Amino acid sequence: MLILTRRVGEALMIGDQVTVTVLGVKGNQVRIGVTAPKEVTVHREEIYARIQREKEQANGRGQVSESEFTEEAFRAAPAISGSGE
């Protein structure tokens, strides 16, 4: 694991097309912004895990598109405070 230190307003690059920017720090929470092409999916870890579980469960029931998993996972996800989430 690469460990980096960033201040509010500073960013890091992942490859040539993904930028992660520190937007703010409040207590033990860090707000980040991710800029990535539309074809790159970006999920919170718990949402990604839910999508993967649903994909595994659906394997026996037939094919379902990733967008259907993503939409269902977002509907079931707990709300996060702040704009743009």
UniProtKB/Swiss-Prot annotation:
MF terms in GO: mRNA 5'-UTR binding
Keyword terms, alphabetized: Activator, Cytoplasm, Repressor, RNA-binding, Translation regulation
Subcellular compartments: Cytoplasm
One Pfam family recorded for the sequence: CsrA
GO biological process, one term: mRNA catabolic process
SUPFAM superfamilies attached to this UniProt entry: CsrA-like
GO cellular component terms, A-Z: cytosol
Gene3D superfamilies per UniProt: Translational regulator CsrA
Family: Belongs to the CsrA/RsmA family.
UniProt xrefs under HAMAP family: CsrA
Free-text function comment from the UniProt entry: A key translational regulator that binds mRNA to regulate translation initiation and/or mRNA stability. Mediates global changes in gene expression, shifting from rapid growth to stress survival by linking envelope stress, the stringent response and the catabolite repression systems. Usually binds in the 5'-UTR; binding at or near the Shine-Dalgarno sequence prevents ribosome-binding, repressing translation, binding elsewhere in the 5'-UTR can activate translation and/or stabilize the mRNA. Its function is antagonized by small RNA(s).
Assembly description: Homodimer; the beta-strands of each monomer intercalate to form a hydrophobic core, while the alpha-helices form wings that extend away from the core.
Name of the protein this chain belongs to: Translational regulator CsrA
Biological source species: Nitrosococcus oceani (strain ATCC 19707 / BCRC 17464 / JCM 30415 / NCIMB 11848 / C-107)
Lineage of producing organism: Bacteria, Pseudomonadati, Pseudomonadota, Gammaproteobacteria, Chromatiales
Gene name as annotated: csrA
